[in-house]
Amino acid sequence: MKKTIILLSTLALAACGQNEAPDSYMSNARESFQNVWEHYRVPEYGLFSEYYPNTFKPDLNYFDDGTHQAQESSFLWPMSGVFSSTVLMAKADPGTYRPYLDSMVVAMEEYYDTTRVPFAYQAYPSRFDRFDRVDRYYDDNGLVGIDYIDTYAVTKNPAHLEKAKQIFTYILSGWDDRFGGGVPWVEGKRDQKPACSNGKAMVLSLKLHEATGDEYYLEIGKRFYRWIRRTLLDPNTGIIMNAWLTDG
């Protein structure tokens, strides 16, 4: 009987833990989200800093053309991370976080470049004019496109769907038949075709198919999938390689 009571007590505690876990995860998410918006947001621009405190401006090494020092606001890659988290929070609790999502949509347009066709998101906001030329990365645009199609799933605003489609058009403009297809990392440079650019393009394409039912996006998604498996999959390990180096 004693063993039975202990067993039942253990099961009851386990059940309580299972019930509390989602609330615990959401509580942690709310706290982390609030910390980012309180400490990283740059109110005068409606953007976010690369680091906290914003006075810390080290060299950043995730660029194709070498290092760049952190600036007044973050580059596009970290900014997309904030966008992604905001979409998920708005999906979980629209009443609380939908205004944050609306704010993010406005902020992302600071990175939108209409001086080059197709239009796309560049690595740093155009308002600051800190660089002679700001690169546009296919993988970053893939992230932003995924953010927009996920935003559309929350808002049902057709403008967000159109934005995702437009970004996909830009990414697809980088596809060429060298080495059987694929897109590079950076616009205008053909030295590599990485998993990050092509994998995100595949995800965006399949999400567009899911949202629209258009078979075109399914076929393009399959094309990216086949290229990744044919070109980047290591048959000995089953692992996708980082990139196909084209040396051109």
Per-region residue spans from a language model:
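Extended ligand-binding clefts on enzyme/binding-domain cores
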Residues: 23, 27-52, 157, 166, ...
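Low-complexity, Ser/Thr/Pro/Gly-enriched N-terminal "stalk/linker" regions
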Residues: 16-131, 158-181
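Surface-exposed, active-site-proximal loop segments in enzymatic domains
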Residues: 122-136, 153, 193
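Short amphipathic alpha-helical segments at helix-loop
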Residues: 67, 129, 152, 189-190, ...
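Well-ordered alpha-helical scaffold segments within catalytic/enzyme domains
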Residues: 80-96, 143-158, 200-214
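Aromatic- and histidine-enriched alpha-helix N-cap/loop-to-helix transition segments
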Residues: 70-84, 135-146, 192-203
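Bacterial Sec-dependent N-terminal signal peptides
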Residues: 1-22
